[in-house]
């Protein structure tokens, strides 16, 4: 609720006597009904009351909020539209400090009618994991996900790997210490995601994760172990969970296609995770067979859960930003409800790079179909 508290405090500073002060009283009463953190509210309120002309009136409102029973709002009061923000922040986890970037889109004015559900004001969250030799701002520039998120709207979280954890800034998807739910990088990424959900107006049922290369491999691991947190996953030029257990097996998997868990593995099939995969068939860094294995595991899990899938080849519908479109084989596995649960975009002559990305970032292929747009479209079909 801290996000809303800050917004309402700013509203209080702008309010004046008379009708607007009465409206502010209703806003704060509604906040108290939805959030038990009264001390936090009081702190923000006192800061708002620092303007001499309002001190007495605001003190009266504070007393009224404590003593007066709730009554329905008589009219709608809203703030001005909130501007977009792309900020650099720090997250502490198990003694380490992790940098991350967060994009918050230009959100509409807050609906403050008592009859309006708070859930209606919440937006999706997409977690984006960069690849090796990248950082968060670079990945944001290359994928242009922020520009798309501004229109959706949704928040975008860009965690950043520690240089001391991997000299190339790769996520350690190949290390057994970072392949489970409760330890290592997957645990950190899940904890960071939950913190953002708690602090910003995020719909917890519409949270997604995607990544490129090592980031794609880590996204697959994190999603597989956190089906209670993520509603879908996107893997671009990555590898399936279980493809490697050390550096040597990682290089082997990258060269020839990694070993994924067998389709009959109960641990792999216990939860269904909608999955979209992008992979260039000319990728010389991560073998395209890895994309095939991710799709195989995802469809096997769906079949085992009783979801009947229809496989179809869908014509390409998203041109590249440059207008020079690479031919793409898009395979869609959809269910009776017409939603696609698995998609595989195999990009002809596509390199080891984010398809349809901007040259402003590293490891991008501006000539490919727009992977960011395709992933967002796929994600928004699904919720937990």
Language-model segments: residues:
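Serine-hydrolase catalytic machinery in alpha/beta-hydrolase-like enzymes
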Residues: 2-6, 93, 99, 112-208, ...
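Extracytoplasmic, non-cytosolic globular domains
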Residues: 222, 229, 274, 289-302
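A domain-start/cap signature at the N-terminus of enzymes
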Residues: 1-125, 137-138, 143, 210, ...
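Post-His helix in hydrolase/transferase enzymes
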Residues: 323, 359-371
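Short beta-strand/loop motif that positions the catalytic acidic residue
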Residues: 277-279, 283
């Amino acid at each position: 609720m801290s996000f809303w508290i800050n917004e309402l405090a700013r509203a209080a500073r702008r309010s004046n006597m008379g009708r607007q002060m009465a409206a502010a009283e209703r806003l704060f009463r509604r906040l108290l009904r939805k959030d038990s953190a009264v001390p936090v509210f009081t702190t923000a309120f006192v800061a708002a009351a620092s303007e001499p002309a309002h001190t007495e009136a605001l003190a009266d409102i504070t007393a009224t909020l404590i003593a007066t029973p709730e009554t329905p709002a008589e009219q709608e009061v809203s703030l001005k539209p909130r501007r977009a923000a792309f900020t650099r922040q720090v997250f502490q986890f198990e003694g380490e400090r992790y940098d991350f970037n967060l994009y918050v889109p230009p959100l509409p004015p807050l609906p403050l009618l008592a009859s309006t559900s708070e859930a209606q004001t919440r937006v999706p969250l997409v977690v984006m994991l960069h690849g090796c030799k990248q950082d968060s701002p670079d990945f944001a520039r290359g994928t242009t996900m922020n520009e798309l998120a501004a229109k959706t709207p949704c928040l975008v979280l860009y965690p950043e790997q520690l240089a001391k954890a991997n000299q190339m800034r790769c996520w350690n998807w190949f290390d057994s210490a970072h392949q489970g739910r409760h330890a290592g990088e997957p645990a950190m990424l899940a904890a960071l995601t939950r913190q953002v959900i708690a602090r910003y107006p995020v719909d917890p049922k519409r949270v997604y994760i995607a990544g490129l290369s090592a980031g794609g491999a880590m996204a697959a691991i994190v999603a597989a172990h956190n089906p209670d947190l993520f509603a879908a996953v996107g893997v671009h030029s990555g590898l399936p969970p279980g493809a490697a257990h050390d550096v040597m097996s990682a290089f082997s998997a990258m060269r020839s296609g990694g070993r994924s868990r067998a389709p009959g593995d109960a641990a792999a099939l216990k939860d269904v995770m909608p999955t979209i995969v992008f992979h260039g068939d000319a990728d010389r860094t991560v073998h395209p067979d890895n994309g095939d294995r991710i799709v195989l595991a995802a469809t096997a899990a769906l079949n085992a859960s009783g979801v009947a899938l229809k496989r179809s080849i869908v014509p390409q519908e998203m041109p590249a930003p440059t207008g020079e479109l690479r031919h793409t084989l898009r395979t869609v596995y959809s269910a009776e409800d017409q939603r696609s649960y698995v998609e595989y975009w195999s990009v002809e002559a596509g390199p080891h790079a984010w398809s349809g990305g901007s040259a402003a970032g590293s490891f991008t292929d501006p000539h490919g179909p727009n992977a960011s747009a395709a992933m967002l479209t796929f994600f928004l079909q699904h919720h937990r």
